[in-house]
Amino acid sequence: MAPSVMEPVAAFDVPTKAAPNLVAPEPEHCPGPESEQAGKGDACAGCPNQAICASAPKGPDPDIPIITERLSQIRHKILVLSGKGGVGKSTFSSLLAHAFASNPESTVGLCDTDICGPSIPKMMGVESETIHVSNAGWSPVWVTDNLSVMSIQFMLPNRDDAIIWRGPKKNGMIKQFLKDVDWGDLDYLIVDTPPGTSDEHLSVNSLLKESGVDGAVIVTTPQEVSLLDVRKEIDFCRKAGIRILGLVENMRGFVCPGCSNTSEIFRATTGGGKRLAKKMGIPFLGSVPLDPRVGMACDYGESFVDNFPDSPASKAIKQVVRSVGEMLGEDPNTVLPPDENDMVE
């Protein structure tokens, strides 16, 4: 029987540490209510929560060793982040997964941790699938022979059902994706996250840190309103100890489906992603133009990279994949062998 969010099986009884019930918001320099210094540090002096934090349970999550063992067969773990919704982060995650998997020598997993807005199954063409449970754990849904997906969407009795959960329950679900899913031997695990810096990001980072998360790819668009939030995302990564693999500028230019020429729609009013990456001291992985056929491919659950290899967007995505591979210490041309379509015009 497949697990369901409406009729949870035993696997949903996720053991989580009880968070302290704070009487006031955490101050700016708070070490964290679950940290070893909670209630003891200099920043705690005078805080209304000091006594509560000092008496709260401390120590590492007991499930982290289990997660580390489960993910030990995965060579590279990549987070995909964005500061703002609507920049194409989930679309980019699906394109990244398809591009990595276009190399038949690579095995790729895509984990959808956007609990309240799971769109990955639709984009990958497996929306109607369900999860199977065996002695080895939950089996991810296989899109192709070398590309698998896990999402809460597979557990919904009806695809339009809303997920209305508070932070601890969402964190418990993410923990199950990492602890109970039988990913097997993977070359790459791509973790698509919700926008912003929320509970899900903290949960994924804390659970993956011991198992060696390689880093994060941050997605933005050229406009300053997106870059404003990306600066916060970069600051979050640095404070959380997440290595930034690089910044990707999405929707930079529009590809005409008739003539394949590229024109600017969302102009970079303050220099765009490339200038921001240079200013913030992080790698710039490349710009991906907006091609209407990307949306069409996602709606039909097909691989845009495979269906439209001559599109400037496909060529740009492949270059980003090679850049990510290089940041991971791999040979870019081994990660994705070049072909005659890959020269970006």
From Swiss-Prot:
Xref: InterPro entries: Mrp-like_CS, Mrp/NBP35_ATP-bd, NUBP1/Nbp35, P-loop_NTPase, YlxH/NBP35
Positions of disulphide bridges: none
Cofactor: [4Fe-4S] cluster
Gene Ontology MF terms in the entry: 4 iron, 4 sulfur cluster binding; ATP binding; ATP-dependent FeS chaperone activity; iron-sulfur cluster binding; metal ion binding
Pfam families documented for this protein: ParA (PF10609)
Residues noted as binding [4Fe-4S] cluster 2 in the record, renumbered to the chain: C256, C259
Binding positions for ATP per the UniProt entry: G83, K84, G85, G86, V87, G88, K89, S90
Binding site for [4Fe-4S] cluster 1: C30, C44, C47, C53
Signal peptide from the UniProt entry: none
Cofactor descriptive note: Binds 4 [4Fe-4S] clusters per heterotetramer. Contains two stable clusters in the N-termini of nbp35 and two labile, bridging clusters between subunits of the nbp35-cfd1 heterotetramer.
Keywords per UniProt: 4Fe-4S, ATP-binding, Cytoplasm, Iron, Iron-sulfur, Metal-binding, Nucleotide-binding
Transferase in keyword set: no
Gene Ontology BP term (one): iron-sulfur cluster assembly
CDD domains hit by this protein: Mrp_NBP35
Assembly information from the UniProt record: Heterotetramer of 2 nbp35 and 2 cfd1 chains.
Record HAMAP family: Mrp_NBP35, NUBP1
Purpose: Component of the cytosolic iron-sulfur (Fe/S) protein assembly (CIA) machinery. Required for maturation of extramitochondrial Fe-S proteins. The nbp35-cfd1 heterotetramer forms a Fe-S scaffold complex, mediating the de novo assembly of an Fe-S cluster and its transfer to target apoproteins.
Protein name: Cytosolic Fe-S cluster assembly factor nbp35
Organism, as annotated: Aspergillus fumigatus (strain ATCC MYA-4609 / CBS 101355 / FGSC A1100 / Af293)
